[in-house]
From Swiss-Prot:
Protein encoded by which gene: rpsJ
Keywords for this protein: Ribonucleoprotein, Ribosomal protein
Gene Ontology CC terms: ribonucleoprotein complex; ribosome
Quaternary data: Part of the 30S ribosomal subunit.
Protein name per UniProt: Small ribosomal subunit protein uS10
Molecular function terms from GO: structural constituent of ribosome; tRNA binding
Function recorded in the entry: Involved in the binding of tRNA to the ribosomes.
Protein family per UniProt: Belongs to the universal ribosomal protein uS10 family.
Length: 106
């Protein structure tokens, strides 16, 4: 059985996300890995509306927005050296990296 790794990368800042994705792809190409992506996933927008005053002026409100950008990279034919290389990479504080390993029947 083969193993595929799905790498989900999330960030609030788009420039940090692109830098992280570029770093991932460069490291993976250097190790001659078969990969698909980076695939741009839909951006998630969250909006929050709060009252400015705690007691009066219901019409006076503030709006806040939080945008989360996401990318997906799929690695085919996982090797132990690639897994060590992936876990050893470090990224900026605003980037979240999620690794999932799936078994693929051949």
């Amino acid at each position: 059985m083969k193993q595929d790794i799905y790498i989900n990368i999330k960030a609030f800042d788009c420039s940090l996300l692109e830098e992280c994705v570029r770093k991932f792809v460069d490291e993976l190409k250097r190790s001659s890995a078969k990969l698909s992506g980076p695939i741009a996933l839909p951006r998630k927008d969250s909006k929050f509306i709060v009252n400015r005053s705690p007691h009066v002026d219901k019409k006076s409100r503030e709006q806040f927005e939080m945008r989360t950008s996401r990318r997906l990279i799929v690695l085919h034919d996982l090797t132990p050296t690639m897994m060590q290389m992936l876990t050893g990479l470090s990224f900026s504080a605003g980037v979240e990296v999620d690794l999932k390993v799936k078994e693929v029947k051949v």
